[in-house]
Amino acid sequence: MAVPKKRKSKSRANSQNHVWKREIVKQARRAVSLAKALLGGNTNFLLVSPGPTTPIKPNPKKQTGRRPRSQRRRT
């Protein structure tokens, strides 16, 4: 018979939500700061690498690690 999961305490849930929201706010501040720097022309501190000089080729078909049936050893 199925048993319901034990509920988390409200204080623990609030604590975890606070940590997640704090990380989101930190990332948002960094994004806004970078956008202001790029739009304002203050790019002396940014290291921007140029794009790749050669075109990127698509990866060949991934090998699954198994040989085709015709090439397998027979035991």
Swiss-Prot record:
It comes from the Eukaryota. GO terms for cellular component: chloroplast; large ribosomal subunit. Its main location: plastid. The keyword NADP does not apply. Residues 49-75 are annotated as: Disordered. It is found in: Plastid, Chloroplast. Keywords: Chloroplast, Plastid, Ribonucleoprotein, Ribosomal protein. Residues 59-75 have a biased composition (Basic residues). GO terms for molecular function: structural constituent of ribosome. GO terms for biological process: translation. Belongs to the bacterial ribosomal protein bL32 family. This is Large ribosomal subunit protein bL32c. It comes from Nephroselmis olivacea. The lineage of its organism: Eukaryota, Viridiplantae, Chlorophyta, Nephroselmidophyceae, Nephroselmidales.
